[in-house]
A protein has these predicted regions:
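Non-catalytic beta/alpha edge segments that cap or flank active sites
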Residues: 2-162
């Protein structure tokens, strides 16, 4: 879990979103360390890239997905993705809107796959994170299983020339 927040990284306040994501991942059966809190911008990309290199199953980030000039998380994360999963980010935005939060439409959150790692960027508000957790609860375990070769027999087999 990567938390993108200039203020939390500087100690102005304690982040409350990262622990929500860690708790959800642990509830879903993932061994998850405490959140990494970094300033907005390039440190977010570096933290996500480190997690991808470590070959973790899932990276969830919170913060930096809006339209504030310092919100750069999607710009840092998107180049790291091998494949985009636009439906995941769209589902999170749609859920927020359906819950009566029209500003959820302003989120630039992205989701995708880097190697065998699922990456999803979430808003920095506790409400946005809770919405994300609701949407991701069934998706994350299934996606991780698929990325590990499950659900499709033979998907781990090397390609053979035809």
């Amino acid at each position: 879990v990567v938390v993108a927040s200039n203020r939390a990284a500087c100690g102005v306040y304690e982040d409350r979103t990262g622990p929500l994501l860690v708790a959800a991942l642990r509830e879903w059966g993932f061994e998850t360390p405490d959140p990494v809190v970094v300033p907005d911008g390039p440190p977010v990309g570096a933290a996500v890239a480190d997690a991808i290199r470590a070959e973790v199953s899932v990276v969830l980030s919170t913060g930096g997905t809006g339209i504030n000039p310092t919100d750069r998380t999607p710009d840092e994360v998107e180049p790291l993705l091998d494949r985009s999963l636009p439906g995941v980010a769209e589902a999170i935005r749609a859920y927020g809107i359906a819950q009566g939060v029209p500003t959820a439409a302003l989120s630039r959150g992205v989701a995708g796959v880097a190697g065998r790692t699922l990456v999803v960027t979430l808003p920095g508000s506790t409400g946005g994170v809770r919405d994300g957790i609701t949407v991701l609860a069934d998706l994350v375990p299934h996606a991780v299983d698929q990325l590990a070769g499950g659900d499709h027999p033979g998907s781990m087999a090397p390609e053979t020339p035809s």
